[in-house]
């Protein structure tokens, strides 16, 4: 039986990892064993980061809505409850965008929320 040499596969595997480690410093870029560990850790951070990004943006939107609601004399929770009672179903992303780019529109929403809370 012929002897199987695995140089091609090893080269391909090493090249794949070293390409992923492009931009890293020192041995993390040049040495396969170290680069492999660095790439695995980077992929773990990337996976975790994709989950954290969702949390961070939701938190940012809530902060922006809260700031705009307080300018209009409402807390965040009372503003959201007022919108719910008024039957206005806008998500936090859209509300935050309105708060940043359309102050008059947000004030109108706040007035509707106040009206729904008073009723």
UniProtKB/Swiss-Prot annotation:
PROSITE patterns: RIBOSOMAL_L20 (PS00937). GO terms for biological process: ribosomal large subunit assembly; translation. Pfam families: Ribosomal_L20 (PF00453). Disulfide bonds: none annotated. GO terms for molecular function: rRNA binding; structural constituent of ribosome. Keywords: Ribonucleoprotein, Ribosomal protein, RNA-binding, rRNA-binding. GO terms for cellular component: ribonucleoprotein complex; ribosome. InterPro entries: Ribosomal_bL20 (IPR005813), RIBOSOMAL_L20_CS (IPR049946), Ribosomal_protein_bL20_C (IPR035566). SUPFAM superfamilies: Ribosomal protein L20 (SSF74731). Binds directly to 23S ribosomal RNA and is necessary for the in vitro assembly process of the 50S ribosomal subunit. It is not involved in the protein synthesizing functions of that subunit. Belongs to the bacterial ribosomal protein bL20 family. This is Large ribosomal subunit protein bL20.
């Amino acid at each position: 039986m012929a002897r199987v040499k695995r140089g091609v596969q090893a080269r391909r595997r090493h090249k794949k990892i070293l390409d992923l480690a492009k931009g890293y410093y020192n041995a993390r870029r040049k040495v396969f064993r170290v680069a492999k560990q660095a790439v695995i850790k980077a992929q773990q951070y990337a996976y975790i980061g994709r989950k954290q990004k969702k949390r961070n943006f939701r938190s940012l939107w809530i902060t922006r809505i809260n700031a705009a609601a307080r300018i209009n004399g409402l807390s965040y929770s009372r503003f959201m409850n007022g919108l719910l009672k008024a039957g206005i179903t806008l998500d936090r992303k859209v509300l935050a965008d309105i708060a940043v780019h359309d102050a008059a529109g947000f004030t109108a929403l706040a007035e509707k929320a106040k009206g729904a809370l008073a009723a």
